[in-house]
Amino acid sequence: MSEHKIKRVLIAGATGYLGKYAAKAFKDRGYWVRVLTRSRERLFEPGPFTAPALEAEDIDDIFVGEISQPDTLTGLMDGIDIVYSSVGISRQRDGLTFEQVDYQCNRNLMDLCQSSNISRFVYVSMQGADNIMDLAITQAHERVVSDLRQSGLNYRIVRPCGYFSDMGVLYDMAAKGRSFLVGPGHNKMNPIHGRDLAEVCVDTAEGDEVEVEAGGPDIMTQREAAELAFEVAGKPIKITVIPMWLARGLVKIIGLLSTQFGDLANFIVTAGEIDGVGPKRGTTTLKHYFESLHAANSKNP
């Protein structure tokens, strides 16, 4: 980073699991940080699965706006050098589709960048997208990537192999005494902690590599991860396997009732079928993450 000019970064998705870590990571590297949010309050609240609450010193400027409504974003890019976005649906609540959020909201950011002096756009997509292009979430993410490639913007793509926040569900089930897996759980993965992934995002923003895959230090099957969760929770292993044929049938029924929930269910089921392994860029182990969840659970039973 230049010694003469502090670079300014915009964090879009700052109230999400990864976005909170990203804001802290950029600030720790000396950046001036602006966050885009619908809710000031949510910035300073802890998120699920040990996502941190941001502190006042983590943020230089709070821009309150609705990313789906460009008319609320006037001035958002003023003075900004780098745009970082991990905007996307993580938990389906508002009845919005992946197309409306994961694609269109990021497209709105890109359009704003075209008329500004942005030096780089950093976008968080997903690893292994080529293998699951039939999914609505993948199509939305990769439309953003395609648009970035054609935009003329200087861009970087980060492709995580899954998030520890998603693995938190395995600990929650184990702590309650029974875990449910879609399929036998033989698929291999190495998800990454949000803190480690945020560091990868900053490295990518500053580096020359255009697309970066990022995984954690542990490669294991989904079943092994579930068994590890029981070990940390101090509970006997009790795993119920939902057969793929049944899971696929349920996805179809859910899709008939709600396109949005059907798309999300389809993604969850497909994730139980395919491997998601990439370069080991994280250092935090899944066991350490489960232990942090267990410690928090013990304090607030």
Features from the language model and the residues they span:
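N-terminal Rossmann NAD(P)H-binding glycine-rich loop of SDR-like oxidoreductase domains
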Residues: 2-32, 37
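Terminal hydrophobic/aromatic helix or amphipathic segment near a protein terminus
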Residues: 224-273
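Amphipathic terminal alpha-helices
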Residues: 271-301
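Substrate-positioning beta->alpha
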Residues: 105, 183-205, 210
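Glycine-/Pro-rich loop/turn segments that contact NAD(P) or position catalytic residues
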Residues: 89-175
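Glycine-rich Rossmann NAD(P)(H)-binding loop
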Residues: 182-187, 212-220, 230-234, 242, ...
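Glycine/proline-rich active-site loop of Rossmann-fold NAD(P)-dependent oxidoreductases
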Residues: 165-172, 203-212, 235-236
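NAD(P)H-binding glycine-rich loop region in Rossmannoid oxidoreductase-like domains
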Residues: 41-45, 50-108, 112-115, 130
